[in-house]
């Protein structure tokens, strides 16, 4: 959320900026470049700025297209729901969600090793999206746009490297629209909806567990063991 950077009175915390490398790629690279927007993008640029307007804006910047990462959140929700329904068969068993949060996963790996068996074996929607794009378009470059600085570190994890080439925050994207004089409100719509409400809900606090719970109920409405969720606010 960058609150630590903004609050640092000594000005010793700096954020990595990827605008210039992305602009250079858009200008020089002769292959496809895809923008992948996080579920939280909805409403970030004003109540009247739709996904269709954003898709038009990305194409004007030079991107081949815009993909909603929420569709990969949908896929991973289904995967986690299937794992939950298979593995959780009593009240004392539990599963940890939020595979999409690199800091959450890093904390478990570094401080709570005993909980690793309770973490689904899923990558984040960002990584899943990048890998899918590159499987379909091997020469493609991928640029993820989202609210979280930690995504910049996640893309460079040894077991994840290569899926996403660059990460921009929403502020970086605003700056990019500003310097290129792109007025989102005046753009025409380019509509191509990708995701369901479950995938989009990943943007909200507790949204992942709610999406998994709802999907488990849809997959197995006769399930005997009740699902109870607990939220851990960081």
Where are these predicted regions, by residue range?
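Processing junctions and N-termini across compartments
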Residues: 1-2, 142
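Iron-sulfur cluster-binding cysteine motifs and their immediate structural context
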Residues: 2-19
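Iron-sulfur-associated redox domains of electron-transfer enzymes in respiratory
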Residues: 16-234
């Amino acid at each position: 959320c960058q609150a630590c950077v903004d609050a640092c009175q000594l000005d010793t915390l700096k954020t990595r900026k990827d605008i210039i490398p992305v602009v250079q790629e858009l200008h020089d690279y002769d292959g496809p470049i895809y923008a992948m927007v996080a579920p939280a993008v909805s409403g970030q640029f004003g109540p009247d700025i739709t996904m269709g307007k954003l898709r038009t804006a990305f194409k004007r910047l030079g991107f081949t297209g815009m993909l909603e990462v929420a569709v990969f959140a949908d896929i991973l929700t289904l995967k986690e729901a299937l794992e939950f329904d298979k593995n959780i068969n009593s009240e004392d068993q539990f599963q940890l969600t939020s595979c999409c949060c690199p800091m959450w996963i890093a904390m478990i790996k570094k401080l709570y090793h005993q909980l690793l068996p309770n973490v689904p074996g899923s990558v984040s929607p960002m990584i899943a999206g990048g890998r899918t794009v590159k499987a379909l378009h091997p020469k493609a470059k991928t640029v993820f746009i989202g609210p979280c600085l930690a995504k910049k570190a996640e893309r460079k994890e040894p077991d994840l490297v290569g899926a996403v080439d660059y990460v921009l925050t929403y502020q970086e994207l605003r700056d990019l629209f500003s310097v290129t004089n792109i007025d989102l409100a005046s753009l025409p719509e380019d509509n191509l909806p990708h995701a369901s409400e479950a995938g989009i809900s990943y943007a909200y606090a507790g949204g992942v567990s709610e999406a998994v719970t709802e999907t488990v109920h849809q997959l197995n409405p006769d399930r005997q063991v009740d699902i109870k969720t607990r939220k851990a606010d960081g």
